[in-house]
């Protein structure tokens, strides 16, 4: 039996692949926002810690874990690595495809703290953060001392999380599917944008190109490295991480 952790485009692809096999599998997401159609799959919702995952795997005879979660879901990645080691269950990491890092036009940041330091050093006063609602608290030193806007998903759970982190709702803007990335940038006139290295399926290239065309500075947080205990696939090739074939990141 196979257990997939998803909630992403990659999760959908994994579902489609396993549905074609015609055998039962489990699909787990943290929340209930992703709408997926399952015939052979069984939906699970809610976060699980290592003990809960190990127990579930033992009870349901899980022999393979597929990590198709967001590249920045570091807690889940670490939990699955722990489960894999302790239960001897292999993990396939369904990785996104990432463009080569542009060192000329993008200021790359190791993590959130590094991003805060570099943005403050450059004296950026108006910032548009496209890093998601869960990063508001991590970036608090920026919005406490400058004008920061966050674009988030237009749903109640996101607004609730923003309020819980103490962020002003007047500086929240909502993602509109299919909307040109330049629309919000032209409306807010930020000096810089802050992104996650979210890959092609995360719209990274479109955001970068929109900012470049408008002369807006770009800061990007590097994706976390994938565990070398995972077997990594990206839909185009199979490799064991780290790999020399991905020279710009050996998330």
Question: Where are the predicted features?
Answer:
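Short, acidic/small-residue loops that bind anionic groups at enzyme active sites
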Residues: 86-105, 214-229
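N-terminal beta-loop-helix "entrance" segment that forms/cooperates
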Residues: 27-47, 161-163
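Glycine-rich, highly charged phosphate/nucleotide-binding loops
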Residues: 41-56, 172-180
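Structural motif
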Residues: 63-64, 126, 191-192
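Conserved small/polar residues in nucleotide/adenosyl-binding loops
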Residues: 239-244
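N-terminal glycine-rich phosphate/adenylate-binding segment common to multiple enzyme folds
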Residues: 49-101, 199
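Non-catalytic interface/targeting segments
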Residues: 1-21, 26-28, 89-93, 97-171, ...
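A C-terminal functional module that forms or caps the active site or interfaces directly
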Residues: 163, 167-169, 175-184, 188, ...
